[in-house]
Regions:
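Structural beta-strand segments of beta-rich domains
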Residues: 50-52
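Signature of extracytoplasmic/envelope-associated structural regions
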Residues: 1-44, 55, 59-87, 91-93, ...
């Protein structure tokens, strides 16, 4: 008999435009339900909406699948759509199984909400799937299936024999983790830190390499209406374009389809936008010398900069388990939405690969594809919803070699540390799920939001001491830095000078690629690489570095280092970072 096997399971992820708004669409041939209901939105609805206000809810029922927006395919779509289940209806307000991922405009009298009956083929449409990224080479995953707080209650009475009288359900907690995955690229690194913006030098401002877009774009948008005239740069399928050039909201996408005209129509992007963009220019990725677009076979370097933000973006996870007989109709799919990656560790040790782990990820809720429970009267399983089954052929499996510890470099207080044996960098946002009073339908009792608290960084380093001669020169040592406590004032003036701390740089390099540039991840502490005295300016400080006498030779020290912030820069051949 067919069974579910660990080596036939995959976990993929994707950034959400709004908390809980998992990203996917529905194909054009998703059938409207017979004479099913349809209506139009009454007012604009932002991404992250948990309910819809419509002009007429007549004909809709709890449990119905509804399509919000319009059908799409590669030749006719001009806006985003998505499918959600109806959880409750009050008047003309429809409550949804999960928040929306996209902005949906007022219908204005034109129907843009439809009752639909998705087929198996509709839910295996590779063109509609976006939750298809792999964090790295992982082996095990703690999935965030709900933890049910069911408690027995003791009431006054004479027949319970000291046992509880009745059990009641409390809150639901969704917490998971992915430990120790090998870093194949830097896409997993930004989530406990903040935003990522991408750029390349292969753009310029000549007319032939620019194209306007007619209207402002929102975070999450997949479709871009082209402005300008037919004499402007044509955007063909596979053309890469940059939005927000020269800013910290710059991002690069690839055109996957062109609707109506490559010069005056609408293009569809390979992934949703991560930032809002005012109407303006987008720049074509091309060779600066010839003002021509890059050939699809040409590899060019992209730089991805990760910087701190107060609010963290949320992610969706999709768990796809294919049975051993490979019958896709029996696949077991679960999706977790609204996840905040609150803590992460980046580590490496001699002889191994550099790894990362998402140590604590809290989610808002989940959906799955196990529709009915076989009881005397079949009931719909709680949290069931129609969704895309993320198939293997659509998953963006990295083809890169991993980053190796032996190809890295660590510098501290201006010195390259030659004898690092291991390092472990930890980030914690101390996030807390909050359970506010809110109208939740069905059996939902999960968090209403997840809030970040104080952010904390630390770095643990194990290193062998330098040669004895170096310890008696002007070269600064770990022991000296520990005693200085980051204060480099004179013996008589150190109080007024104040603490400064020192800079740390961790560089991970992956050999030369075909074009001659190196894939590289650079972690800079503090974020600007320039520790200084004063608030929000300090660098790193050694808290402990005991020079114990052990059996290790040469002499080995384990240092614990505190620092206040960092930035990460990644250079590789990936145009898109989520």
């Amino acid at each position: 008999m067919a069974v579910y096997r660990a080596d036939q399971a995959q976990v993929t992820f994707m950034t959400e435009p709004a908390a809980g708004g998992y990203v996917e669409q529905a194909p054009k041939d998703t059938a409207k339900t017979g004479s099913g209901a349809d209506t139009d939105l009454d007012g604009n609805h932002e991404a992250g909406s948990t309910s819809l206000t419509v002009t007429d809810s007549t004909g809709f029922s709890v449990g119905d699948a509804i399509l919000i927006g319009y059908w799409h395919d590669s030749t006719t779509a001009t806006n985003e759509n998505e499918i959600r289940q109806i959880e409750h209806i009050t008047g003309n307000v429809i409550y949804l199984s999960a928040p929306t991922a996209f902005y949906h405009a007022d219908g204005g009298g034109t129907d843009n909400v439809f009752e639909v009956t998705p087929t198996t083929a509709n839910l295996q449409d590779a063109d509609s799937q976006y939750i298809n990224l792999i964090p790295g080479a992982y082996e095990t995953v703690d999935v965030p299936d709900p933890e049910m707080a069911i408690e027995g209650r003791w009431f006054l009475g004479t027949t319970s024999k000291r046992a509880f009288y009745a059990a009641y359900s409390g809150q639901q907690t969704y917490a998971g983790s992915i430990g120790g995955f090998a870093l194949l690229d830097g896409k997993a690194l930004r989530y406990p830190i903040g935003k990522v913006y991408s750029t390349t030098t292969f753009t310029n401002d000549v007319t032939a390499m620019k194209r306007t877009f007619a209207a402002a774009l929102k975070k999450g948008d997949l479709y871009v209406a082209l402005g300008g005239t037919s004499s402007d740069a044509a955007i063909a399928v596979t053309t890469k374009v940059m939005f927000g050039r020269g800013s910290e909201t710059s991002e690069i996408r690839q055109s996957t389809s062109v609707l109506a005209s490559a010069s005056a129509g609408t293009i569809r992007l390979d992934y949703p936008l991560q930032f809002d963009h005012a109407a303006g220019d987008m720049h074509v990725i091309g060779t600066a010398a010839s003002n021509t677009t890059i050939a699809t076979t040409q590899t060019i370097p992209y730089t991805h900069s990760i910087k701190e933000t107060v609010d963290l973006d949320s992610v969706s996870w999709h768990v796809h388990m294919l049975p051993s007989d490979e019958t896709r109709a029996n696949a077991f799919d679960r999706r977790y939405y609204g996840g905040k990656i609150g803590s992460m560790t980046i580590s490496g040790e001699e002889g191994g690969m550099v790894t990362a782990s998402w140590d604590g990820v809290n989610f808002l809720g989940m959906i799955h594809n196990q529709k009915t429970v076989d009881l005397s009267t079949d009931i719909t399983t709680p949290f069931f919803a129609d969704m895309q089954s993320i198939i293997n052929s659509k998953v963006d499996f990295p083809t890169n070699e991993p980053y190796y510890f032996s190809q890295g470099e660590v510098t501290m207080f201006g010195q390259t540390i030659a004898r690092i044996r291991s390092f472990s960098l930890s980030i914690s946002n101390n996030e807390e799920p909050r359970y506010y009073i809110k109208k939740q339908m069905g059996r939902k009792r999960g968090p209403t939001e997840i809030r970040e608290q104080r952010r904390e960084y630390s770095l643990a380093v194990t290193l062998a001491l330098p040669d004895a001669a170096a310890a008696n020169t002007a070269q600064r040592t770990l022991f000296q830095e520990m005693l200085l406590e980051g204060n480099y004032g004179s013996a008589t003036d150190f109080i007024r000078t104040g603490k400064k701390g020192f800079d740390v740089s961790i560089t991970l390099t992956r050999g030369n690629v075909v074009t001659g540039f190196e894939d590289k991840i650079t972690i800079t502490i503090p974020d600007d690489g320039a520790a200084a005295t004063g608030g929000n300016q300090q660098g790193a400080f050694i808290r402990t570095a005991p020079h114990n006498i052990t059996e290790d030779n040469p002499f080995q020290v384990e240092a614990d280092i505190l620092f206040r912030n960092l930035s990460i820069t990644v250079q590789d051949a990936e145009h898109y970072y989520p």
